Regions:
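Repeated scaffold domains used in trafficking and secretory/extracellular systems
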Residues: 278-289, 330-343, 373-385, 412-423, ...
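A short beta-strand motif characteristic of beta-propeller blades
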Residues: 267-277, 320-329, 363-372, 405-411, ...
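C-terminal outer-membrane/trafficking sorting elements
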Residues: 665-715
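Structural motif
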Residues: 255-262, 302-312, 353-356, 395-399, ...
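A short beta-strand micro-motif common to beta-rich folds, especially ectodomain repeats
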Residues: 633, 639-653
Length: 715
């Protein structure tokens, strides 16, 4: 039986007399003046069913984790989504207090198909529009009065004044979208239990405290009141977990369509084209700061229906496209590569130069480097310490200081690709072999590979990232080699043993399979090797083979037959940097204490040497100053006192901090030499370490005959 208290409670909440023409009601907690008929149709929507009808056991699309659960139900108007109410689930721990805002944010972030237009105003979090990407192309933008914007974690955050003039755009057939117009808006309904009837909520989602087994629902009201909760529910299937497998970026079929991305789960299941319309000829991808940055040579293939971007930025959890950048720099160079600098900046390589990408605003901000060379391609790059080492494909290795984007040195070399090894060294592939980068002298040192070891393959005018890569678990690098475009051999170089060997040989493969492009990489966490192999010159018959580090075949994963042209594997970044405790620093006035930060931080899916260290702040700079140079923290005492130095560690675009306590002492204040009891002065030095013959004003370092050393200040 329908519960009458729902109607009574609703009536009491209306600031209305029976004969009034308008009334004030709360819409998602915000008071609004509406015609009395609008208030009546809200009650009609809530009274349509005696219970929510939701069965938690049927929910498959979940967000969050924990021992408590809630359901989310959304119904669009005008028959969208075939008139069904879509259902999601949300979990959290009973030790936590969660609100309706937490629920909706988590679900929208987790589901790449769901997005919303919302804002924070005086009355809390207010939702102006919901959309659902039914065709699954994950290609959604919002057109406002002034701009076309992309969602962040599924949310378009704009002022509520722009709600009526904003519209979801660039979505396909079957997609759903409703936004306020006139007196049509999204109503908020709740139930404490799935067996209860939904009640119109007089409070907003920010004020709603969730309880185990509750239901939050949103319904778009219409002028005729026809849109009601009618029990026609659709339990959405589970979404793909993009954190446990590997991505395979495809070039796409040139002249026929844009690039796309396939995903191989840990259990060997393929999800095809989970991100599409990237751009023409996908060529590079990197995980950085909970996003994927995918490079394409051009923004649109001649045979594609949609324009993508030379840079496509995707959310790492959902592979939802956040933004696409069609052109890179004023010269419009073709996209090539990406190298993260910190959580705010990155470099992108093109056919005209290297440019700085502002990661916060997702736009090209500066030109870093261009050259007078013709037919240039700025390809693979690696950051180590304060510098980025960038390959000008087949020509030079450029060393760039990240702090000010200054070119420090150009090393003449036929450099093709670069990688970092477990021990923190950099290795460059050249036309004749492998070279180690001497980062102290900024020189290349060729490595003797021995007989029968081929030089790395290069892409011979059709750029790809090449097969040079390194293990995170062992001090080993790998490269692919071949006399033509198809790679037939994989070589391994053990750095500790200074020994190279042939690991994989496809010259006698029974199916005549070869590695296409740069589709060979090492999983940083498992140390397994992944290679995409195409059969002969058909290009449509592809299989991914997974090997142990010693070359033992572990599994094969055939792909659907298509002109994929797989380019490169990309592994999810699922681990954050972890920082060990750092000892307190004690310094005298004028003294500099150096702390090596190299081994202070670790990351289970990144090289230790690749973790960027910097000083975030000094609590009191009148007590001490601090800076980091090439991973070395220098703390200098200024005056006696205590302060804190906060050091930031950035790994794969994710940062964490560690506070270091600093105590600065006042050295012995004397006007001449004061010796230790029974000891005599044998040497005296200035603060810069130079030997002096007599006391001089400032900090003096005095060594005594008993071996002790004292720092004194001479005034």
């Amino acid at each position: 039986m329908k519960k009458n208290f729902t109607s009574i409670a609703f009536a009491l909440c209306l600031s209305i007399a029976a004969s009034a023409q308008t009334t004030t009601i709360n819409i998602q907690g915000a008071p609004r003046k509406v015609p009395a008929a609008v208030a009546a149709r809200l009650q009609k929507a809530a009274d349509a069913t005696a219970s929510t009808g939701i069965d938690f056991s049927k929910i498959q699309r979940w967000a969050g984790s924990g021992d408590c659960q809630a359901a989310l139900a959304i119904k669009w108007a005008e028959g969208q989504n075939e008139g069904k109410t879509l259902v999601w689930g949300y979990r959290w721990n009973s030790s936590e207090t969660k609100t309706g805002e937490d629920l909706i944010r988590a679900v929208v972030k987790a589901d790449p198909a769901l997005y919303m237009m919302a804002t924070n105003d005086t009355w809390g979090y207010y939702i102006g529009g919901f959309g659902y990407d039914a065709d699954g192309d994950r290609y959604v933008t919002l057109t406002t009065m002034t701009d076309e914007i992309y969602p962040r974690n599924g949310i378009f955050d704009i002022p509520s004044s722009e709600f009526p003039t904003s519209a979801s755009t660039r979505y396909g057939d079957g997609d759903a979208w409703n936004t306020p117009e006139g007196y049509n808006y999204w109503g908020y309904f709740t139930a404490d239990n799935a067996a209860d009837a939904l009640r119109y909520s007089m409070i907003g989602t920010s004020s709603r405290t969730l309880t185990d087994g509750c239901v939050d629902a949103y319904l778009f009201s219409t002028d005729d009141g026809s849109n009601v909760f009618d029990g026609n529910l659709e339990y959405l299937p589970a979404t793909t977990d993009f954190t446990t497998g590997t991505f395979l970026l495809n070039e796409g079929s040139y002249g026929h369509g844009n690039a796309d991305v396939n995903y191989l789960s840990a259990d060997g299941t393929w999800t095809y084209r989970n991100t599409t319309e990237i751009g023409a000829t996908g060529c590079f991808a990197a995980a950085w700061g909970n996003r994927y940055y995918i490079m394409a040579k051009q923004a649109k293939d001649g045979g594609a229906d949609k324009t993508g971007g030379r840079i496509t930025i995707c959310d790492a959890n959902s592979m939802r496209i956040i933004k696409q950048i069609a052109d890179i720099g004023d010269n419009g160079g073709d996209g090539r590569s990406f190298c993260g600098i910190d959580e705010h900046r990155a470099y992108v390589g093109t056919t005209t130069g290297i440019y700085e990408l502002d990661l916060d605003n997702m736009e090209i901000s500066k030109t870093v480097l261009t050259t007078k060379n013709t037919n240039i391609e700025f390809g693979n790059m690696a950051r180590l310490g304060d510098y980025v080492y960038a390959c000008e494909y087949g020509k030079n290795l450029h060393v760039i200081r990240c702090a000010d984007n200054t070119l420090v040195k150009t090393i003449p070399a036929d450099a093709y690709s670069i990688t970092m090894s477990k021990d923190g060294q950099l290795w460059v592939s050249t036309a004749t072999g492998i070279s180690r980068v001497n980062t102290s002298k900024l020189e290349l040192e060729p490595v003797s590979l021995g007989e029968g070891i081929d030089a790395p393959a290069n892409s011979a005018g059709m750029w790809n990232p090449d097969g040079l890569c390194a293990s995170l678990q062992n001090n080993v690098i790998y490269w692919t080699s071949s006399a033509n475009w198809m790679t037939q051999k994989v070589f391994r170089y053990d750095i500790d043993k200074a020994s190279a060997s042939l690991l994989l040989d496809y010259t006698s493969d029974p199916d005549s399979r070869n590695i296409y492009g740069a589709a060979f990489r090492v999983d940083p966490k498992t140390d397994c090797l992944y290679a995409n192999l195409v059969k002969g010159w058909t290009y449509t018959d592809n299989v991914v083979r997974k090997y142990a580090a010693d070359g033992t075949l572990l599994a094969e994963y055939p792909l659907q037959q298509a002109y994929w042209f797989p380019e490169v594997f990309v592994f999810p970044d699922t681990e954050d940097p972890v920082v060990a405790d750092i000892d307190d620093v004690k310094a005298d006035e004028g003294q500099t204490v150096n702390i090596d930060l190299t081994s202070c931080a670790t990351d289970a899916d990144n090289f230790q040497a690749a973790i960027v260290k910097s000083v975030e702040k000094v609590g009191d700079e009148s007590v001490a100053t601090a800076c980091v140079q090439n991973g070395m923290l220098a703390v200098t005492g200024v005056k006696a006192g205590t302060t804190t130095v906060t050091v930031k560690f950035c790994s794969n675009g994710i940062s964490t901090t560690k506070d270091i306590n600093v105590t600065v002492a006042n050295p012995t204040d004397i006007n001449g030499t004061v010796g230790n009891a029974g000891a005599r002065e044998v040497a005296r030095y200035a603060a810069d370490g130079s030997r002096i013959q007599q006391p001089q004003p400032g900090l003096n370092i005095v060594k005594y005959s008993d071996g002790s050393v004292r720092k004194i200040v001479v005034r």
